[in-house]
Amino acid sequence: MNLFQHKHQKLILQCYPAGKAVDKKPNSSELSYLLYYASTRRVKLEKVINFLKDKTHHDVGRNRTGNLQVTLAIIQELIKKCSENLNVFAFQVCYILQSIANTKDLALCKNVVKTFGVLCENLDGGLFTGDKEFIKIFTEVFQTLVSFGKDRSGVTQYDWQMISLMAINDISSCLSYNAAVGKKFIALSIPVLLQFIIANNPQSSILQRLKSNLHVEDDGKRLSRAHSQKSHSKIAQQIDDDFTNDSLTLTDITEKAFSSMKSFFNTNAASQISEVTRAVVQHNILNGTDLEWGVSFLELCITWIPVQLRFVSLSTLLATLGRINIEGNTKSNYNMQFQYARYLLGLLSSRVNMIGLSVSDIIQQLLSLQADLILKASDLDKSEISILTDIYSDCICSLTTHIYYFDQVPDSIQEILIKIDYILESSFVEDNNITSTGEQIQDLIIQLLDNISKIFLILKNKSSSINRNHVNLEHWDISLGLLAPQGDHDDNRKMIISTPQLINIQAKYLKVFDEFLNNELAVGNSKKSYDLLSKQSRLDPGSTAVEGVNKSDDSDNGKDFKKPDANQYITNQQNFISHFLMYIDKFFENYDSPNTQSVLLLVTVLKDMMNILGLNFLSNFIPFFHHWVMKVNRASNFTQRQKFKDTFAHIILYYMLKDLDEQYSHDLQNYCKSSKLFKQILDAVEYRKMQKFWVYGIDPSPSDLENIKGDRTIPTDANGNYIAIRIKPENIEEFACGNNFLIVWLHPQKQLLTEIEKSQVSTHMSTFNNDSRNTNMTVIMDQGSSALSGGADHGGHFVPPPEFVNHTGLSSESASSNSEKGLYTGLGLGTAGDITMIHSEILQYSQHFQERGLPHGNGFATILRTVDSVNSTNDGLIYTYDSKYLQSPRVSDLKDAMSTHRGIRLSKPNFGGANGTANMTDSASTSNGSVLNKNMQTTDVDSILSGLESEDEAAFVV
């Protein structure tokens, strides 16, 4: 022994037992003192590690295995004791490990990998950011250990493989320190892990593990997490014991491979998750791994990722597909795109939940991939394009139907419809800027519509315990342009879609929309007749049951769209029903002779809308009926377009009246089919058949109207000529006035909607609230007095109570209390005598209704007043208790309004100011629904007269 050894050398050498045994262990007391010595000062630590490095080199050269085992044990303890100064001696540790690993002695290499594990546990990011020499030697050590498991055979095969797997498992904790180095470690590790897993695990084994991770057992019982964690701990302990005792099995290797793979995915580093996902998929593709196996395995890997970061893997696949798409869809990258798309579909269609997933963003990217496949030039075959397109379609459907939040389905459908609208807009191009063909546009729009169809079909057949919001009619507003795209574009651009292609698009659109009506909108209560309890509660002003009934409409059973004014489909004329009918009118205007099959589909769709919407549909349809019906009493020659519209209008009105009795059986009691209007429809149809005005083949089979035998008697004039039969506005008005239920909700004088207010187009359905109406009218009642009652006080005629009156602000709602049968006759301009009589009635009845309230009016509300309170007045009220301030409209005012396209403003005092004082100079506009506010369509007298229905009206205008 050298008498002049330094103290640190003596302390180190004292730790080595004497002898040449191969399984030496350091002397414990001497090791403790050495650790204390090394930890006291940094310079001492440097001396210790440098001496150990030199001794290792000496012992390796002389094959002193026992001493090397002691050195590894000392290194492990030094790392643990001096971890805060690990950067001082980490390089030397790696050098020692590399030197010993190069001996390829199994016992030594087992201890090397354990020491490597301790080193990885105590490393931090500092060494990976600034010490290039350390990174180099650390990587060499890792590569050496990983290489031990490759192409091994014999009795020690499992031991060498376990060394590789343990090194890979240990390196997983160092991946996030340096992006470039971590990427290299992943590239070295993933192929080795997959090699072990693929060789020893068929797809059935992968699926079983996946099912276990999803906590779904064959018997339906959930797997206990505590039990699962305990099982994993026991497995890990068993592997360590077998590794120490040289008794490893294939099961140990398999479990360690899965455990190591899990350590790569089970991280909070998004970049690591992305890189590992890409490495797994890329390896499977390049090595020809069975696609179904690979998809199942990736699903298993996703279950190991923290749930809030699982979307990162999905986004990685989508980003890769995006890069491929930018490079161009060619045969050279078709297989890569196909496989990535299948992996993406596997994740989206699995039962793996992903929190934080941006559904709308992903759908937008998928739609872009679909669009580029069809629109962009490529050398792919049509079959290859079809395969990829179908995969993306399945991805969209799977994502949409895996419910994460209430509005997911509506949001997804809306994204698709917005894409369709954008594609349709792009079909209008300048002559020198054509990039796509009409056939490509057609194929893409039909594909996007098919996506929607698949979604509704899946939702119909898929039961879910998660409540969701349903797609509503208003979501489809943006898609109505498909019915008449030419009408929305009046610039110089031309549409590259041909007429046959447009007909194909429209046919697909109508079929998909009809599927929506029957599978998505018509759920629960909407399939049933109008709720009788709701009706009875509304007729009883003192009932409190109506609130509960209304709330039930929003339950899981679906909303009752047959309820009058559901979603304000009657009070608000700017609604989807009117918009849809307006675009149908544009549809007819675009064709001289519309396609029979397209019109047949339109009839089918509207019949389904009738069944769902009931009276709400009829109220919006009436203005369009008058617009479409031919004036057979004034002409005998009509275009084919006019015949189509006329036939279409009669078919819809016929089925509407036929269905109303069943939908509102308690209220109507078979009134519709026994009404004069119903008979007039049949006569009008028969007349058109006899005059060859009727268009056959647009009523779905079996057709009631076309199967009716021609045995009806059509009236003739004195010369024996058939009298032209045309249903006029007064016929429908008479029909509405004949039933107490219809009079409240049906508005025969509703104006024809000719323009859509863009601000009214909303993608979200309003709540069912029939109280969200105009309340310009106030009824002043003494405190403690009872509510208005119909019956005796009103001559025995039905007068709906305030809770039941539908306040629309429409002209048809204003009525004369003296009108025939006690019912309103609608608000027209009338003659000069009519205006004078109205003014007289106002003065006569104003005092009469002061205390008793008003039977009709625009916007009922109730204001209680005490005995000492000051009377408050209405805002724009036609009935007034301060009649001295009322200024009667003059005929000259009306004529002036018509000629200048302005509405009349009636001066009235303002009693509702902030200071309570009246302002005699204030004026109030006429009500929104007043004809005085309507702009005249034309100032040509002849055209005005031709549109009037009676001689009285014509005489008044003249």
Swiss-Prot record:
- Any one GO biological process: protein localization to plasma membrane
InterPro entries listed in its UniProt record: ARM-type_fold, EFR3, EFR3_HEAT-like_rpt
Top-rank taxon: Eukaryota
* SUPFAM superfamilies the UniProt entry points to: ARM repeat
Region named Disordered: 540-564
| One Pfam family recorded for the sequence | EFR3
Q: Where is the composition biased (Basic and acidic residues)?
A: 550-564
* Cystine residue pairs: none
Stated family: Belongs to the EFR3 family.
Q: What's the protein name?
A: Protein EFR3
Q: Which organism is it from?
A: Candida albicans (strain SC5314 / ATCC MYA-2876)
Give the organism's phylogenetic lineage.
Eukaryota, Fungi, Dikarya, Ascomycota, Saccharomycotina
